[in-house]
């Protein structure tokens, strides 16, 4: 499919080749397997969106994309929202509310906010529905025992992915890998990263893992532009959200 496209549209093909080379080159530990996965595997949609994502990188300057972040790398107002959200999540009894539903499926997800719009679910957490300035998506993911994801890329860089493990893990068999970075949930409950980088989450423990799942608008001198783009994405993806989370059981009611 790619060869005929390059033959009939050589300039567009060259443009996409350059954008894709830059985009995939951001992954540390780059190898042939990563290239194959990006260009002809599950990273293909990320390649298709690479010009758009590069534009988002430019709009985010002077805040350079670090790939993997510490909380202190974010502006103070962003840090404050993250801390408030984490405290609200700690105060909610997610384990008790989700334990029974999660037993039926390897991976479960419940959303309280989706790209800037609050969602009604079977579990009411009023603190999640406060007017957030930067937080766009709030969910809780549940990994059953001995359940991991495959290696995959996210699609869009208008947001940063923020994960916070809600329950205490007993050993280092639960962790996330992004490029050359491995973070163990037993040691560090908070992990912030650009999810368009190749990543994989592991739960090889005998525990169910409950994780706060958040998308936060990237720091930018043009936050209004970022919000408008995110709103557009919400409208475009609302009716086929299942494609994003086809390997998850999304609980709504």
Language-model regions: role of each:
Residues 161-166, 192, 207-223:
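A short hydrophobic beta-strand segment most commonly corresponding to one strand
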Residues 149-151, 174-175, 193, 199-204:
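Short beta-strand His + acidic residue motifs that chelate non-heme Fe in jelly-roll/DSBH
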Residues 127-145, 158:
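A short glycine-rich, His/Asp/Glu-containing loop-to-beta-strand
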Residues 184-198:
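Conserved metal-binding segment of the jelly-roll/cupin
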Residues 12-128:
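Non-heme Fe(II)/2-oxoglutarate
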Residues 2-15:
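Transmembrane helix interruption/hinge and helix-loop junction motifs
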Residues 142-144, 155-171:
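Short, conserved beta-strand element in jelly-roll/cupin
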Residues 167-187:
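A short beta-strand-loop-beta hairpin characteristic of the jelly-roll/cupin
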């Amino acid at each position: 499919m790619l060869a005929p496209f390059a033959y009939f549209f050589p300039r567009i093909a060259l443009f996409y080749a350059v954008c894709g080379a830059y985009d995939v080159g951001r992954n540390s530990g780059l190898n042939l397997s990563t290239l194959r996965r990006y260009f002809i595997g599950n990273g293909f949609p990320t390649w298709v969106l690479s010009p758009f994502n590069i534009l988002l990188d430019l709009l985010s300057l002077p805040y350079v994309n670090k790939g993997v972040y510490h909380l202190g790398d974010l502006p103070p107002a962003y840090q404050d929202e993250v801390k408030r959200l984490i405290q609200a999540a700690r105060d909610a009894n997610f384990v008790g509310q989700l334990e029974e539903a999660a037993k039926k499926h390897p991976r479960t997800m419940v959303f309280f906010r989706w790209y800037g719009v609050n969602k009604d679910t079977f579990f009411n957490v009023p603190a999640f529905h406060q007017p957030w300035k930067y937080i766009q998506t709030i969910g809780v993911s549940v990994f059953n025992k001995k359940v991991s994801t495959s290696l995959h890329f996210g699609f869009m860089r208008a947001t940063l992915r923020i994960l916070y493990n809600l329950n205490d893990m007993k050993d280092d068999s639960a962790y996330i890998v992004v490029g050359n970075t491995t973070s163990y949930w037993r040691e560090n409950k908070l992990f912030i990263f650009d999810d368009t980088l190749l990543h994989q989450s592991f739960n090889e423990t005998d525990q169910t893992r409950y994780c706060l799942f958040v998308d936060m608008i990237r720091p930018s001198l043009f936050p209004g532009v970022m919000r408008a783009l995110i709103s557009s994405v919400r409208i475009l993806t609302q009716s086929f959200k299942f494609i994003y989370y086809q390997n998850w059981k999304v609980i709504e009611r």
